[in-house]
């Protein structure tokens, strides 16, 4: 059994870069890049690099073996993908910049070489796999919900990428739009607009200008019935 705080601290952006910079070849294998909002990058199974996000947000998307499309959102401190098993790498995947992004492009072979010495307990991989487990579990739960609840669920899921104003009030990420929320919730834009209008009428959401604000997180959780949803075992 590991302490979450220990794993998360070791796998933080700052510590990963600190460990990589211990190697004198760091500047030859790690490059800091700026990528503009709206840029889309397509990847095949050959993954020579992975990316460590310092600023901005991205959407990582791929099609599963049965044709199901998966998407995941990542912000500062995350890496959209980390190729652990070759067989698990999708044939085609895409990263879309939801905002201007600054990240480190890291050669995976260099990362493996350094971490054999600096992370012998594989804390960084454990943190990545734990996060992936939570995300896939959330997708499973969301798939069981009706259209309205999927929208509620998506809004609540975006809290971690937002800015908490008060204990019960959160600014949502600036990239969020009706179209994006409909996409994340697997609903139509028209139905999404209707549900958001109802939330505004109940004084739960402010979406007339950006950033959108959930003004009553607990009430939104109550509408979803969040406490009754299955929890990650």
Model-derived regions: residue spans:
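Phosphate-/nucleic-acid-contacting segments
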Residues: 161-233
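Cyclic nucleotide-binding regulatory module and flanking cytosolic helices
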Residues: 1-40, 78-80, 84-87
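Glycine- and acidic-residue-biased ligand/ion/polar-headgroup-sensing regions
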Residues: 48-61, 65-66, 76-77
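Short beta-strand segments in beta-sandwich/barrel cores
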Residues: 31, 40, 57-62, 79, ...
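His/acidic/aromatic-lined binding-pocket segments of jelly-roll/cupin-type domains
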Residues: 32-33, 41-43, 47-54, 71-72, ...
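Polybasic "coupling" helices that flank or enter modular domains
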Residues: 122-184
């Amino acid at each position: 059994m590991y302490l979450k705080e220990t794993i998360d601290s070791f796998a933080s952006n700052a510590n990963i870069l600190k460990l990589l910079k211990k190697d004198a070849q760091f500047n030859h294998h790690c490059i800091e890049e700026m990528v503009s909002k709206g840029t889309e990058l397509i990847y095949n199974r050959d993954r020579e690099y992975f990316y460590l996000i310092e600023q901005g947000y991205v959407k990582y998307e791929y099609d599963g073996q049965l044709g199901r499309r998966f998407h995941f959102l990542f912000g500062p401190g995350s890496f959209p993908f980390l190729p652990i098993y070759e067989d698990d790498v999708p044939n085609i995947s895409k990263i879309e910049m939801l905002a201007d992004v600054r990240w480190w492009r890291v050669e995976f072979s260099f990362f493996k070489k350094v971490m054999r010495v600096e992370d012998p307990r594989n804390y960084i991989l454990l943190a990545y796999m734990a996060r992936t487990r939570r995300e896939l579990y959330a997708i499973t739960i969301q798939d069981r919900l009706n259209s309205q609840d999927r929208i509620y669920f998506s809004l609540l899921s975006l809290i971690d990428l937002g800015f908490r104003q008060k204990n019960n009030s959160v600014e949502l990420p600036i990239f969020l739009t009706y179209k994006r929320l409909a996409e994340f919730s697997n609903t139509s834009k028209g139905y999404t607009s209707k549900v958001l209008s109802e939330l505004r009428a109940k004084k739960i959401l402010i979406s007339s200008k950006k950033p959108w604000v959930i003004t009553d997180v607990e009430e939104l959780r109550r509408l979803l019935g969040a406490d009754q949803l299955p929890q990650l075992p």
